[in-house]
């Protein structure tokens, strides 16, 4: 029998007038992997992935976005630079050197902005189910995301929206009926719209792992291919089968394996320690 999974500790980090709750687990002196969640959702979405990364010897940090858990800060009049600054404060506070920053869906834009604004804090980024295009998602997709988070709708309506926007055929979306923060979702969407997609598009000069679901209505395989063509050797693409936009919930083993494999390339001859 292996050791039981380590429960994360919870700390609050100050970033000027902002307070960011951080879930931390794994080797305290291990190489740092930071996990950033999707639009309107929190750090718990990464529970299964974080456990696997910590078990591989890495120090795993999960900052809660503003408005979730104990994280507090302005939600109006901000943009992606502000969200990236929150994550920068977390990495700097940890003091273990540049981190491998993993962004799921909306979190991928925050990861790319952080790599642009603070390259000294970013060893590499992973873009997970990334809508990498320079235009916003189509109206039907945006509406499905709103419906997924809208507790005033019937369960059947929300399941239909979740299945369309987030889950591949055959994958049960009902686990994502919970975990939504509509006010945070709206604030993050406005912040994203206030930020030109040109600003974060290239992720600075960081190496990029691109985890591409094979059934994603928001993040298309063709977009991943075009992104690699533009940035060449900086980009490594891994397609995650039988998954859609909620890939970290649908295929946590495959996502974790890809992240661990890439981390071992970033830090050769180490297992996180």
What are these regions (language model features)?
Residues 112-116, 123-151:
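Flexible "cap/lid" loop of the alpha/beta hydrolase fold
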Residues 234-273:
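Catalytic active-site module of serine/aspartate enzymes centered on a nucleophile-bearing elbow/loop
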Residues 23-70:
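Conserved HGGG/HGGXW glycine-rich cap/lid loop of the alpha/beta-hydrolase fold
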Residues 208-243:
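Conserved loop-alpha-helix segment in the C-terminal half of the alpha/beta-hydrolase fold
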Residues 55, 62-102:
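Active-site loop/oxyanion-hole signature of alpha/beta-hydrolase fold enzymes
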Residues 136-139, 151-204:
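Conserved alpha/beta-hydrolase catalytic His-Asp/Glu region
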Residues 15-25:
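A short loop-to-beta-strand scaffold at the N-terminal edge of the catalytic core in hydrolase folds
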Residues 103-107, 111:
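Gly/Ala-rich beta-loop-alpha elbow adjacent to hydrolase catalytic centers
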């Amino acid at each position: 029998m292996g050791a039981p999974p380590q429960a994360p500790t919870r700390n609050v980090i100050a970033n000027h007038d902002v307070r960011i709750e951080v879930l931390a687990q794994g080797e305290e002196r291990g190489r740092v992997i930071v996990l950033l969640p999707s639009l309107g959702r929190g750090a718990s979405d990464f529970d299964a992935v974080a456990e696997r990364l910590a078990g591989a010897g890495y120090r795993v940090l999960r900052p809660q976005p503003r408005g979730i858990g104990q994280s507090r800060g302005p939600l109006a009049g901000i943009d992606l630079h502000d969200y990236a600054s929150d994550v920068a404060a977390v990495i700097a506070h940890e003091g273990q050197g540049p981190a491998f920053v993993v962004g799921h869906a909306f979190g991928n834009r925050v990861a790319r902005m952080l790599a642009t604004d603070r390259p000294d804090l970013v060893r590499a980024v992973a873009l997970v189910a990334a809508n990498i295009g320079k235009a916003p998602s189509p109206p039907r997709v945006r509406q499905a995301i709103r419906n997924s988070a809208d507790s005033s709708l019937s369960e059947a309506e929300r399941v239909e929206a979740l299945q369309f926007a987030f889950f591949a055929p055959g994958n049960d979306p009902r686990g994502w009926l919970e975990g939504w923060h509509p006010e945070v979702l709206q604030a993050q969407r406005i912040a994203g719209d206030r930020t030109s997609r040109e600003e974060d598009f290239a992720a600075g000069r960081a190496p990029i792992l691109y985890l591409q679901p094979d059934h994603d209505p928001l993040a298309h395989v063709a977009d991943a291919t075009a992104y690699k063509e533009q940035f060449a050797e900086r980009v490594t693409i891994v397609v995650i089968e039988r998954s859609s936009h909620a890939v970290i919930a649908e295929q946590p083993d495959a996502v974790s394996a890809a992240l661990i494999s890439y981390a071992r390339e970033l830090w050769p001859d180490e297992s996180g320690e």
